[in-house]
Amino acid sequence: MISDFPLLTFITLFPISAGLLIPFLDKKGNQLVRWYTLIICLIDFVITSYIFIYKYDLNIDTLQLIDDYAWVGPIEFHWKLGVDGLSMPLILLTSFITTLATLSAWPITRNSRLFYFLMLAMYSGQLGVFLSQDILLFFLMWELELIPIYLLLSLWGGKRRLYAATKFILYTAVGSIFILMAGLTMAFYNSNVPLLDFQSLANKQYPLALEIVLYLGFLIAFAVKLPAFPLHTWLPDTHGEAHYSTCMLLAGILIKMGGYGLIRINMELLPNAHVIFSPWIALIGGIQIIYGALTSLGQRNLKRRIAYSSISHMGFVMIGISSFTDLGLSGAMMQMVSHGLIGAGLFFLAGTSYDRIRTLFLDQMGGISTTMPKIFAMFTTCALASLALPGMSGFVAELMVFLGFLKSNAYSFDFIALITFLEAVGIILTPIYLLSMLRQMFYGYRKLKLTNTLLLDASPREIFIMSCLFLPIIGIGIYPNLTIPLWNTKVEAIEQLNVFKSVGFK
């Protein structure tokens, strides 16, 4: 279905285009640029919501609202955007989290104009990744969001920000090279004219050896972004040094690009290779759940502890993608949405706590619950959501992945038992490191010599941000059908591919 007005093009280009006007705003103070950026994000979020409510059909599993314009004629490079059940929930998540991250960044006063422009540029890049239907355009959008993150980290990070920023760009740039090489190989293989759009690539047939090589190239790139063990080491450093508004974008949106890429490209375009690699992806996902949980427990730094918990939770996404069941893949989508909300909330609360106590080391904290009861209550609620308390979105997501893999007919009983055991151990470990984090932060005697005047409780702005996050976290937990219909039709279509219906590793 092609749209009359290019709505998807508008929501993709509007943030970065509006950001180019920031230098022309009144340079006195930061108030104007804050409100300007927030209004731009709100407008984009409202239009995205309008697309979902009035233009998007939940019962169609093919692309909708397609914007297709020839860009570079000689190589058939098109500006082609489209939305379906994989991209719709993620562009809604992107718009929602970016708007809240912009509001959370209000305390920033140094070079605020550049900061807010970079946030808007990153906003456009992330929307572009989820909406692109051309492999070369997908690569360009993938690259577009890297530059703002590097600058946000290197200019507004902690003491080791340059090390973290360099490590981030090296990891992700290497992954991007694999996307470009594999994408161009797919486009030019057995074709006089390059076929760059996803629909054409899905209809191509490759020799199995070539498909395996292509799959491996994309897998490396997306495993870095997810991040998957052992390509995860950039994430704790990045989260540990970035400003918490940047962390909200990293945890809420950026790492979801890896899971999205695995489904959109590896699973849909290279299904034969996906069958071969799926047991290994599931095994790595199970190991990653336990590794992330155990490593998180050993972290003294609050943000690094939350970062390793993110690595652990992304293991469920990998298992869901490898399950070959509607329920498992739907659970992977739910986990990406759920963790996007919960992860953003945890990093926001970690940042607001740091603004008051000026330390991130858990062994230096303690006893601040009585002076900051609202922050204590919000942190506790968010941690309970992360450990998959029933009634929260995290519980629904992990249960769907757990049951989805358990009912899979693709694997032997022994392999299913192994992965289920790894998941169960991870689920047991999660409360240990999260409740330990709460105990070290809020209970016991106060170790820091801070007066009560410095330990201010949550402001109305901070309460509003967390309330906005808690609303979908609890809403999805109580009534999962708020989100499942967004991707259910598409998930069923993917799992009905002939290649997947005949899978069996007995």
Swiss-Prot record:
GO terms for cellular component: chloroplast thylakoid membrane. The chain crosses the membrane at residues 5-25, 35-55, 88-108, 114-134, 135-155, 168-188, 209-229, 243-263, 275-295, 309-329, 331-351, 386-406, 415-435, 463-483. One of its GO terms (molecular function) is NADH dehydrogenase (ubiquinone) activity. Keywords: Chloroplast, Membrane, NAD, NADP, Plastid, Plastoquinone, Quinone, Thylakoid, Translocase, Transmembrane, Transmembrane helix. It is an enzyme of class 7 (translocase). Its EC number is 7.1.1.-. It comes from the Eukaryota. It holds the Pfam family Proton_antipo_M. InterPro entries: NADH_Q_OxRdtase_chain4, NADH_Q_OxRdtase_chainM/4, NADH_UbQ_OxRdtase, ND/Mrp_TM. It is found in: Plastid, Chloroplast thylakoid membrane. PANTHER family: NAD(P)H-QUINONE OXIDOREDUCTASE CHAIN 4, CHLOROPLASTIC (PTHR43507:SF21), NADH-UBIQUINONE OXIDOREDUCTASE CHAIN 4 (PTHR43507). This is NAD(P)H-quinone oxidoreductase chain 4, chloroplastic. It comes from Chaetosphaeridium globosum (Charophycean green alga). The lineage of its organism: Eukaryota, Viridiplantae, Streptophyta, Coleochaetophyceae, Coleochaetales.
